[in-house]
């Protein structure tokens, strides 16, 4: 038995005949010491509801529950994993709800409300499937209601994506993702995870990112900000007067008080907000 009284994860995947599917962006994390570290990176989980995406055979799920989460709602698209997750649920009666479905079609705000946590009580903790991780993060960063339905997000990404999330202006990694994350959250990389921690091992290093919502982000229309960053970074090597030409070009930049010869990667989050509010 493992430290939580359940079978080792390698035994679980062997008994259930589970193999990670590349089409689903799966890489199973089998080291319970590592899943425990991820759970602890999310903060004190005592009496907290947690939403998890892509639990697979339940390694992180087990860590969340053993670290005190009052309730975990786990969304799993792969029906092959449901039997293994049912065993975890039986070990923690009444504390794990497994939702069989597609995370991209999930109403997370409704899910959080049903989990019994008002805003500030629900945390998102997940080893996100690589093929949908960025899309999910953007959705969570751009929810209309703010403060959002989550108190924090602790998420695993490929390190290259993680670096884009926490990137500062002027760096090669800085782009739309960094602007959105910096606008609405305080984001940091908690730690890196080597490929050999996974089954099968991916070709790249992964990173766990912790994001906490800002109570009062600078006011801006989220859809407009999306259009501005898309235009600006769509031609990131060009001067802003060219890259945002479709939004008003030099006249827009003049209203925002921004030098039209600058490039998108040099603008701070505050300047992007100013630009957005000038559209």
UniProtKB/Swiss-Prot annotation:
Q: Which residues bind S-adenosyl-L-methionine?
A: 27, 29, 54, 76, 102, 127
PANTHER family hit by this protein: DIMETHYLADENOSINE TRANSFERASE (PTHR11727), DIMETHYLADENOSINE TRANSFERASE-RELATED (PTHR11727:SF7)
At the top of the EC hierarchy, this enzyme's class is: transferase
UniProt keyword terms in alphabetical order: Cytoplasm, Methyltransferase, RNA-binding, rRNA processing, S-adenosyl-L-methionine, Transferase
Task: Name where it's found.
Answer: Cytoplasm
Q: Which family does it belong to?
A: Belongs to the class I-like SAM-binding methyltransferase superfamily. rRNA adenine N(6)-methyltransferase family. RsmA subfamily.
Reaction catalysed by this chain?
A: adenosine(1518)/adenosine(1519) in 16S rRNA + 4 S-adenosyl-L-methionine = N(6)-dimethyladenosine(1518)/N(6)-dimethyladenosine(1519) in 16S rRNA + 4 S-adenosyl-L-homocysteine + 4 H(+)
Q: What is the protein's name according to its record?
A: Ribosomal RNA small subunit methyltransferase A
> What gene does the UniProt entry assign to this protein?
rsmA
- Sum up the protein's function in the record's words: Specifically dimethylates two adjacent adenosines (A1518 and A1519) in the loop of a conserved hairpin near the 3'-end of 16S rRNA in the 30S particle. May play a critical role in biogenesis of 30S subunits.
- One Pfam family linked to the record: RrnaAD
Per the UniProt entry, the Enzyme Commission number(s) are 2.1.1.182
Cite a single GO MF annotation. 16S rRNA (adenine(1518)-N(6)/adenine(1519)-N(6))-dimethyltransferase activity
């Amino acid at each position: 038995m493992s430290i939580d009284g359940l079978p080792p994860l390698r035994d679980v995947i062997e008994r259930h005949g589970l193999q990670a599917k590349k089409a689903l962006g799966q890489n199973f994390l089998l080291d319970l010491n590592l899943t425990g570290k991820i759970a602890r990176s999310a903060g004190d989980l005592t009496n907290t509801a947690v939403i998890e995406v892509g639990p697979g055979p339940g390694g992180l799920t087990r860590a969340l529950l053993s670290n005190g989460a009052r309730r975990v709602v786990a969304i799993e698209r792969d029906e092959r994993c449901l039997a293994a997750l049912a065993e975890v649920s039986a070990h923690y009666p009444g504390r794990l709800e497994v939702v069989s479905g597609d995370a991209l079609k999930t109403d997370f705000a409704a899910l959080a409300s049903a989990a019994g946590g008002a805003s500030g009580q629900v945390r998102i903790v997940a080893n996100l499937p690589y093929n949908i991780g960025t899309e999910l993060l953007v959705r969570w960063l751009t929810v209309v209601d703010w403060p959002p339905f989550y108190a924090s997000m602790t998420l695993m990404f490929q390190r290259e994506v993680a670096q884009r999330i926490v990137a500062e202006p002027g760096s090669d990694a800085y782009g739309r993702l960094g602007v959105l994350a910096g606008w609405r959250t305080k984001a940091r990389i908690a730690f890196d995870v080597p490929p050999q921690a996974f089954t099968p091992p991916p070709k790249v290093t992964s990173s766990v990112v912790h994001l906490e919502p800002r109570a009062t982000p600078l006011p801006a229309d989220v859809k407009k900000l999306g259009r501005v960053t898309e235009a600006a970074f769509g031609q990131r090597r060009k001067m802003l007067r060219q890259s945002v030409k479709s939004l008003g070009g030099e006249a827009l930049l003049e209203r925002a008080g921004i030098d039209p010869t600058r490039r998108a990667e040099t603008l701070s989050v505050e300047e992007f907000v100013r630009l957005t509010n000038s559209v």
